[in-house]
Design a protein with these regions (language model features):
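Bacterial N-terminal signal peptides that target proteins for export
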Residues: 2-16
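Intrinsically disordered/low-complexity terminal segments and short unstructured peptides
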Residues: 8-12, 27, 322
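C-terminal motif of bacterial Sec signal peptides marking the signal peptidase cleavage site
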Residues: 23-25
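Domain-length functional cores that host ligand/cofactor binding and catalytic or interaction surfaces
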Residues: 29-211, 312-316, 326-487
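Extended, regular secondary-structure scaffolds
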Residues: 163-265, 304
Length: 487
């Protein structure tokens, strides 16, 4: 009897411990409970009013489920937000000018996120910009605490990895990744004409003519390139790729994301679009711009002849990124799918891959290098039908927008404020940064690797790109770990 009781107590204790571990992995700190914001809330002056205004707005945003997941509110400073690039800049802050530039970046991140949240929640609060400035001035003496708090949690769950016996289960995953590497190398080694075609090859070309992009001639106090909206648009237009897609069905056609009557994201293939943004990375001691293009498809259909495909599901996205130098010329290309999967690197002659130690963790995988682009050339991406896997990256003379189908460039942040059929707006992404309805069956088998809902389409800033190890697509230190500039 005593043994049974002890066994029951032991099992209950284990269950409680595991539950606590999962909860701990999901727990987030209320940014209003820490100083200086917790102290500001107690004040009876304008600072106190502003602190309570932000708290009230955030409470309403959370109740309505409109929180934007791209960036993170800073604990103790919830009128500011941080992303991985801003967090990586923190150690550079040494002077008053650098502190001002860094604080301005965090302030701008909050302004951008709140613009979407307030629009989607149909809230109009005129005092927020003034209050953000006032709170920033009131908290100026807490600059050291701000830098310590401006951190971004990674997108891996310790609890899931612990429950999934990650040290053991990662072994078959690592073997599977090695097989994928072999298969991918084999495809990239094929003569281009030998790559199988299921349907018909169709090219999507960016709108507008090829233009030389003016280099960013100035940087801010932190070394971040400063360029006008027109210069950014020219740079994005210059490096926008041509897509050569094996089209075997509607699921292989590019389109614009829109919301249906149930607020679920779908793809309008009558409006081909690339969603673009500019990001930043650190390489060779300098900050470099990154041009990011996201292309959406309506689905990844089940493999031909398959009755059950773990990887199939609604929506599929391909992300293409170009890291450029100060003159606006490509250094490295890389790509993932919008789930964070299939991370491939395509270095140019301007960089050299570092010698990395052998490890089980996913690391630099480059099935192909690329030459430097000539002034009249564009990159062409060959994409497989159904899976939308990259099969080859080519360079070819630009033919303008006179071939096949033209796609437009649109700001990627517009996806956080899509029009609803019944009026108003809503983000394509949930508060968890995932697109509802794009779940994959693989999530039931891949969870021991610690990634929430593996295979599901997700928002910028939420792409974990390694099942084995830890890696994020927007990690600004990633390229410096993998490459060095050729001398």
């Amino acid at each position: 009897m005593m043994r049974v009781a002890r066994r029951q107590i032991s099992c209950s204790s284990v269950q409680l411990a595991l539950a606590a571990l999962l909860l701990a992995g999901c727990a987030t700190v209320d940014p209003y409970t820490l100083p200086p914001m917790s102290q500001n809330l107690q004040r009876e002056d304008n600072v106190g009013y502003c602190a309570r205004l932000f708290a009230d707005i955030d409470r309403r945003i959370d109740l309505l489920g409109m929180r934007d997941a791209e960036t993170h509110r800073v604990a103790g400073f919830p009128y500011l937000r941080v992303d991985r690039f801003s967090a990586a800049l923190s150690p550079r802050v040494a002077t008053a000018a650098q502190q001002h530039a860094w604080h301005s970046r965090l302030r701008q991140l909050d302004e951008t996120a709140r613009a979407a949240e307030l629009t989607n929640a149909a809230l109009n609060v005129d005092d927020l910009p003034r209050c953000r400035e006032l709170l920033g001035a009131a908290d100026a003496a807490a600059a050291h605490e701000l830098r310590a708090a401006a951190k971004v949690p990674d997108d891996y769950s310790i609890g899931m990895r612990t429950l999934g016996l990650y040290p053991l289960t990662r072994l078959p995953f690592a073997a599977g990744i090695a097989r994928w590497h072999e298969d991918t190398r084999a495809v990239f080694a094929m003569p281009i004409d030998a790559i199988p075609v299921r349907g018909m090859l169709h090219r999507y070309s960016p709108s507008g003519s090829l233009r030389e992009a003016a280099p960013a001639l100035t940087v801010d106090a932190l070394g971040v390139p400063v360029s006008s909206a027109a210069e950014q648009a020219a740079l994005l237009a210059r490096h926008a790729p041509v897509l050569e897609i094996d089209v075997a069905g509607a699921f292989d056609r590019l389109g614009a994301l829109e919301l249906d009557a149930d607020d679920r994201a779908s793809v309008d293939t009558g409006a081909p679009v690339a969603y673009a943004r500019i990001a930043y990375t650190l390489l060779g001691g300098m900050v470099h711009r990154q041009l990011v293009y996201t292309f959406w498809f309506s689905e990844r259909p089940p493999a031909s002849g398959s009755t059950f495909d773990l990887l199939a599901g609604k929506l599929d996205g391909v992300i293409w990124r170009v890291t450029v130098d100060a003159a606006g010329e490509a250094l490295v290309y890389d790509s993932i799918h919008a789930c964070g999967c299939y991370h491939l690197f395509f270095p140019t002659e301007k960089v050299v891959a570092r010698s990395l130690p052998a490890t089980l963790d996913e690391s630099l995988f480059s099935p192909q290098a690329l030459p430097n682009l000539l002034p009249n050339e564009r990159v062409v991406l060959r994409i497989e039908s159904g899976t939308h896997y990259l099969q080859r990256v080519l360079t070819a003379a630009d033919k303008g927008s006179s071939i096949d189908t033209v796609y437009d460039l649109k700001a990627e942040r517009t996806l956080t404020m899509l029009a609803r059929p019944g009026g108003g707006t809503r983000s394509a992404y949930g508060e968890d940064g995932l697109i509802a309805g794009s779940e994959r069956s693989e999530r039931w088998f891949f969870w021991p690797m610690g990634i929430e809902s593996a295979g599901q389409m997700r928002q910028w800033g939420r792409h974990a790109t390694a099942f084995v190890g830890r890696r994020h697509f927007d990690d600004p230190l990633l390229f410096d770990a993998y490459f060095e500039l050729r001398r």
